[in-house]
Amino acid sequence: MEELDVEPSTTLVPAAGVLQKHLGFEWGPGDLLVYETNYKLRGSSSAGSPLVHVVRKDEDICSPILRKLFNESHLIFMGLQKIKEDAPSKNKKTQFVSISRNYRSVIRACMEELQQNAVTAQDGSLASQYGDQVSILLAIELIWNLCEVLFIEAAPAGSLLLHLLNWVRLHKSDVDTRAREVLQSENPTQHPAYWDVVTSLVLQGRMDEARQILSKQASLRMESSSVFKRMDTLLQTMPIFNPAGAQTLTEFDVKWRHWHEECDRCLQDHTFASSAELETLCKILLGDEDVILEQKDLMSTWYHFLVSRLLFTHPTIKPPDLHYYAQSSMNMFLGPRATPEPLDIILLSAFEFDLHQVIKDCSIALNNWWFVAHLTDLLDHCKLLQSHNLHFGSNLREFLVLEYASGLFTHHSLWQLAVDYLDHCPEFGRVYLELQIERVPLDTERKANKVLRICEDRQMSEQVRSICKIMAKRALRNNRLGSALSWSIRAKDAALATLISERFLQDYSNKGSFTDLDVLDNLGPAMLLSDRLTFLGKYREFHRLYGENRFSDAAKLLLSLMMAKIAPRSLWMTLLTDALPLLEQEEVIFTVDQTYELMSCLEELNSGTKDSNQMEQEEDLESTKTELLRVALARNLATAIVKEGTIET
């Protein structure tokens, strides 16, 4: 897309910069943080305001009703991505039109709900907000519908005008309301809006409905019934092209010209001179542009004027000729002094078949990326944007989808939808996902597990480790050691696993028992992640064997922990003390060699450097434990020698 050639809108930040302070800012994923600095434009620096202002462009993402739009359009988007490239073109076109209509039905449903809320809202500002959102969705649906007609359906001459008539009827539906009011009144022909309704129906090409209302007048005015019958005949015989019929465009054109000549003859013969309203209708049927333009209050928009003008002057308009009529209709309707609104410029670009200008102007005018992202994606699938690449490597479709998905990532629940959008951005989607997924707030373990599944399914190993480390540290801060250990193992972080294992052992030293046994008993091969974790797992296994009265296995495991030197030195005395109950069993558990090894460990422990900060009471306790162990080891050694000597004999 080209560089922005219009001035961006100004956003006022309340109370910021009042004291002529410089403003600092920081970009976030979906918003901008603005704050006052200590520096003034003039004079010495001083303390600024402590407030940080959050400036957000896309406010719609916070609306509960519009979230339904985002959720439902996500399903349509995913269905569109499944359409196979090799499907027949005719089948694909039908599918694309159906998908486009699905998008529009979602917009309409959302718009209706917003309108209901605007009516029932007690708060005036909230009602105004709903009204603004309805206006935006109306414009979006209007543009989308026109793009559907011109680009997706690509209606040819003849059919094109029929589609444009349906487009105008859909977006100028107040005629139906006024028609009901007229018909339901006591005297429809005397209703102030009677002729306005008839004229409006004719301008929309709804001739049968116009005839129905005109018949009310004809039945009351017997003296001029022939005049009304003549108008009824003109309305009834007006040719309408039927794309499904056998009639060619040339045949239709000949038939239409004959009908047009008949209208002109009626006007020249002053057939309707007795009724100014019928004469005006005849001039409209004849395509008198000045008379049609006089009804601008009934049409209210230049594009309604365009379609009505084409209906009565050029019903077989070809797509390439549309832009001329569109430009001249807008100029005639708005006048030389009026400035077109952004919506007018966008619609004019569509009539000029300038797709990229439509997308560019919509990106500037609308307050979120939803519309341009989904419309561009659909148009790209229709192969209408293949020639347009951006200077920075991505194509237009991917750029807009990336922007939309990035906005979704700022919402507490919609971020999950964003993942699917990024999955379908082949060039930069993976990079964006890796950056954005780490910014998702991990409020709960359930949410963290959702994020992890997304990362694991996509082999994003770095993000998996990062998330697991965050959760492990959070659990550790909250003293949830079992959860912390599980997360550190999933992160494959040896240093963190060692730290948590230390906390487990410290907790055991203080309480005399282990917590989170379900985690410790099911470590499996994961205990090999670090030496300290291995020790923790094996030490817990020792306690389990001891509890199951498997004393011999427990003794071997305890001794292997001592000899392998993987136990922290601070726990040696604890391990040796754990051997005391085994040494005092009636049955000899430790062999002579094993007893010597335990003695060696005890002496090595006592020969080490003493902690100068160790209190006297602690020294006495250590000495008592040492004496008890020496006695128990000596007694066990004697018993083991006797037993082994007896066996040898």
UniProtKB/Swiss-Prot annotation:
The keyword Transcription regulation does not apply. GO terms for molecular function: structural constituent of nuclear pore. It comes from the Eukaryota. GO terms for cellular component: nuclear membrane; nuclear pore outer ring. InterPro entries: Nucleoporin_Nup85. One of its GO terms (biological process) is protein import into nucleus. Disulfide bonds: none annotated. Pfam families: Nucleopor_Nup85. It is found in: Nucleus, Nuclear pore complex; Nucleus membrane. The keyword Membrane applies. Keywords: Membrane, mRNA transport, Nuclear pore complex, Nucleus, Protein transport, Translocation, Transport. Component of the nuclear pore complex (NPC). Component of the nuclear pore complex (NPC) that seems to be required for NPC assembly and maintenance. Involved in nephrogenesis. Belongs to the nucleoporin Nup85 family. This is Nuclear pore complex protein Nup85.
